[in-house]
């Protein structure tokens, strides 16, 4: 009895648990069905709402500039090197010991300034010997001339023969020749002595010394004592394509000096301004270019020999040219074009013919007029007839942010 009673209770408990589980399963299924229609409706509404958002989105921002009419200079550009107007290697003309140097490396000197001295002792001795020989031969000549005068008187009375008179005359002439040779020897010795004092042959800047005091130097030394480069004035040699020769020649015939500007290696800073000096007499067949030389006063020493520069030569000025920023000019399948803004800020593509241009601006010969507004930034988002919003160019950081950044950098440097 007890066993059957327990079995019935177990069956009851199992049935209750099964009923509870079935209830929870049925309740969850109903919840999922009720949630599905709402989700489907939301999903169906999403594309429509997205399309409405696109239609009501902001206008494409662009930056614009106005085409202006102005005089535009035409430059020919080339790469060049600064060269000294004259370069002189100062060498000794005589052999001897270097006694003194009278210059500071890098200083400016004038022609005739004393640069160095060689021991003059041997040259003074040679000069004294030459002067002594000259004095001796002058005395001999004076005595020979007196004897000749006596011979001439005696010959009148036939006390001396004609042969003796002629011999005395020849002796005088010979001694006179010796005197001339002695005078040349004196001049040579004096010149050797003078050359022991070495002076600057040209105005210019001296370089680093090539020899120290106390060394024995000679006229055959190839390195010399110092090199002088004439930098006032100084020259710029650069190259132009052979196609520019006619333009340069035509500009020269106008009679005005052609202005040449020297810019630094990065072409961002103007160093000096000079004038065209000459064109080479032949074209380099290998490169198809011609060498051009310009001269600069260089009083501020902005240019140094062997310095690499960018040359710009003004050959003409185009008057009343229509100019726009270079950033506005675009290139497409049909050629060059710009995006032009109308009064409603709608853009349209205009084909143009560009002329003179540089990194900042370009001349437009045809296609637009002065006063037209052209797009300079935001071009990649444009389509024909699209309306845009013209905005001002803005810096990546505000002045306050820049000041904060600088202060932070200072603190970081001190830490």
Curated annotation (Swiss-Prot):
Cellular compartments annotated: Cell inner membrane
Entry annotated with the keyword Ligase: no
InterPro entries, per the entry: CusB_D23, Multidrug-R_MdtA, RND_pump_MFP
Membrane topology qualifier: Peripheral membrane protein
Signal sequence range: 1-21
Gene3D superfamilies (UniProt xref): 2.40.30.170, 2.40.420.20, 2.40.50.100, Helix hairpin bin
Domain of life: Bacteria
Keyword Zinc carried by entry: no
Record's compositionally biased regions (Basic and acidic residues): 399-415
Record's GO cellular component terms: efflux pump complex; plasma membrane
Region feature Disordered, mapped onto this chain: 32-60, 392-415
Swiss-Prot/TrEMBL keywords: Cell inner membrane, Cell membrane, Membrane, Signal, Transport
GO molecular function, one term: efflux transmembrane transporter activity
Family to which this protein belongs: Belongs to the membrane fusion protein (MFP) (TC 8.A.1) family.
Function: The MdtABC tripartite complex confers resistance against novobiocin and deoxycholate.
Subunit structure: Part of a tripartite efflux system composed of MdtA, MdtB and MdtC.
HAMAP family with a match to the protein in the record: MdtA (MF_01422)
PANTHER family associated with the record: MULTIDRUG RESISTANCE PROTEIN MDTA
Protein name according to UniProt: Multidrug resistance protein MdtA
Gene that produces this protein: mdtA
């Amino acid at each position: 009895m007890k066993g059957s009673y327990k079995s019935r209770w177990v069956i009851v408990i199992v049935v209750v648990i099964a009923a509870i589980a079935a209830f929870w399963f049925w309740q969850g299924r109903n919840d999922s069905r009720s949630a599905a229609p709402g989700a489907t409706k939301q999903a169906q509404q999403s594309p429509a709402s997205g399309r409405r958002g696109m239609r009501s989105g902001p206008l494409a921002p662009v930056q614009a500039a106005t085409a202006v009419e102005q005089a535009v200079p035409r430059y020919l550009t080339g790469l060049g090197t600064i060269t000294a107007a004259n370069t002189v290697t100062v060498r000794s003309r005589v052999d001897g010991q270097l006694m003194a140097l009278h210059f500071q490396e890098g200083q400016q000197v004038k022609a005739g300034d004393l640069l160095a001295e060689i021991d003059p002792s041997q040259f003074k001795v040679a000069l004294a010997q030459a002067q002594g020989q000259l004095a001796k031969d002058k005395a001999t000549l004076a005595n020979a001339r007196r004897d000749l005068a006596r011979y001439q008187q005696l010959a009148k009375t036939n006390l001396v023969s004609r042969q003796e008179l002629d011999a005395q005359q020849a002796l005088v002439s010979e001694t006179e020749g010796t005197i001339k040779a002695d005078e040349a020897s004196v001049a040579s010795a004096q010149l050797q002595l003078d050359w022991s004092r070495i002076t600057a042959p040209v105005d210019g800047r001296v370089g680093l010394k090539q020899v120290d005091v106390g060394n024995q130097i000679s006229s055959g030394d190839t390195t010399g004592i110092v090199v002088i480069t004439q930098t006032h004035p100084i020259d710029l040699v650069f190259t132009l394509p052979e196609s520019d020769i006619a333009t340069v020649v035509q500009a020269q015939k106008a009679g005005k000096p052609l202005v040449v500007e020297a810019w630094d290696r990065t072409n961002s800073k103007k160093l000096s301004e000079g004038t065209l000096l000459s064109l080479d007499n032949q074209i380099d067949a290998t490169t198809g270019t011609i060498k051009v030389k310009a001269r600069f006063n260089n009083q501020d020493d902005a240019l140094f020999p062997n310095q690499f520069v960018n040359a710009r030569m003004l050959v003409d000025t185009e008057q009343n040219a229509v100019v726009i920023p270079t950033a506005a000019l675009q290139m497409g399948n049909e050629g060059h074009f710009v995006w032009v803004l109308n009064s409603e800020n709608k853009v349209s593509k205009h084909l143009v013919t560009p002329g003179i241009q540089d990194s900042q601006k370009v001349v437009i010969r045809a296609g637009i007029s002065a006063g037209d507004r052209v797009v300079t930034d935001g071009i990649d988002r444009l389509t024909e007839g699209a309306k845009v919003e013209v905005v001002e160019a803005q810096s990546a950081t505000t002045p306050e942010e820049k000041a904060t950044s600088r202060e932070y950098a200072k603190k970081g440097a001190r830490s």
